[in-house]
Amino acid sequence: MIIERLVGNLRDLNPLDFNVDHVDLEWFETRKKIARFKTRQGKDIAIRLKDAPKLGLSQGDILFKEEKEIIAVNILDSEVIHIQAKSVAEVAKICYEIGNRHAALYYGESQFEFKTPFEKPTLALLEKLGVQNRVLSSKLDSKERLTVSMPHSEPNFKVSLASDFKVVMK
């Protein structure tokens, strides 16, 4: 089965009205536009998203829906650094330092709380900066993602030369 577009999200439906099968994804797999996965019930699916969400697949995104059958995304819990800022200045410092490392940054559960995937160097940096943090297991859902940039990604557009293209040497 080839999935080329999203059909909706489980939060907009009553999941009890459907037979829901899930594709379990790690947080870093949610940004893939082309991939192969197996659902919990053993169905092979290929994803080739034409208009992939800019931030990636989110928890509950519906990949397939036919009558009462649904295949939806489940983002697995992973080891995450939960960061609690004490002030707006500390928020700026956190965003700068995490962004400087090109690490993913997500909104947390409350104001001034953020999440980033666990990496020892990031944890050491936060400790050095005196930023309150703790390592927990939780979901990193794309809809909560702050950073949009994606290193080493392929562009989502085609490049072609215009018929009137000219190179001028001066």
Swiss-Prot record:
Keyword terms of this UniProt record = Chaperone, Cytoplasm, Nickel, Nickel insertion
UniProt keyword Acetylation present: no
Mind listing the GO biological process terms from this record? protein folding; protein-containing complex assembly; urea metabolic process
One Pfam family per UniProt: UreE_C
Name the major location: cytoplasm
Write one Gene Ontology MF term. Answer: nickel cation binding
**SUPFAM superfamilies associated with the record:** Urease metallochaperone UreE, C-terminal domain (SSF69737), Urease metallochaperone UreE, N-terminal domain (SSF69287)
Cell compartment(s), UniProt: Cytoplasm
Q: Which family does it belong to?
A: Belongs to the UreE family.
Outline what the protein does.
Answer: Involved in urease metallocenter assembly. Binds nickel. Probably functions as a nickel donor during metallocenter assembly.
Name of the protein: Urease accessory protein UreE
Q: Which organism is it from?
A: Helicobacter pylori (strain HPAG1)
From which lineage does this chain's organism come?
Answer: Bacteria, Pseudomonadati, Campylobacterota, Epsilonproteobacteria, Campylobacterales
